[in-house]
């Protein structure tokens, strides 16, 4: 009998280490859970009629270049936050400095804010009980993110224009990016 395929060990290698301690610990926990993840096949009920099986090859495990250049749209009506290959680009972003609004990259978070971000991520779909026959690949995002974005709105805060989060992913070569965006909105806030 053929053994069930599991995720390549290349996906289990640690990513960058520039995050606060609580986010690094969360990422380590998620990566540990991936070690035993059995990948779906055509015999998996939810994948039964899939034309192709899931191929997560070693070259896809590599992180896309963090210094990739992209052109940003300037004709948008509103505020923008730009992520390139899963990493926030403050210099390409345009968002307000407004009392009651906090927009921070994960790597710039204080330990208290990093703990809030980790707690929000722990409430994600990856911590929900899996349905019989389902495969939870959301653990992959929690194990591989390099950076992320925490948007916090205090109660009653109103942002006067839309806030667009723009993801750019370069496709020069194989690899992957794992953007992570968390919004903590207080009562009666508007974004």
Language-model region placement:
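Glycine-rich and polybasic anion-binding loops at the starts of cofactor/ligand-binding domains
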Residues: 1-191
């Amino acid at each position: 009998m053929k053994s069930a395929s599991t995720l390549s060990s290349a996906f289990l290698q640690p990513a960058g280490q520039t995050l606060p301690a609580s986010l690094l610990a969360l990422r380590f926990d998620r990566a540990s859970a991936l070690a035993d993840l059995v990948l779906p096949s055509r015999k998996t009920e939810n994948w039964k009629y899939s034309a192709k099986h899931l191929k997560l090859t070693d070259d896809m495990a590599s992180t896309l270049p963090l210094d990739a250049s992209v052109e940003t749209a300037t004709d948008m009506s509103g505020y923008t936050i730009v992520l390139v290959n899963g990493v926030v680009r403050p210099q390409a972003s345009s968002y307000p400095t407004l009392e009651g609004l906090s927009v921070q990259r994960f790597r710039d978070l204080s330990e208290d804010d990093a703990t809030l971000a980790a707690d929000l991520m722990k409430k994600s779909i990856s911590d929900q009980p899996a349905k019989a026959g389902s495969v939870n690949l959301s653990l992959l995002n929690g194990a591989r993110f390099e950076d992320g974005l925490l948007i916090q709105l205090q109660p009653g805060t109103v942002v006067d224009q839309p806030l667009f989060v723009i993801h750019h992913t370069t496709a020069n070569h194989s690899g992957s990016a794992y953007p992570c965006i968390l919004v903590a909105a207080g009562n009666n806030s508007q974004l």
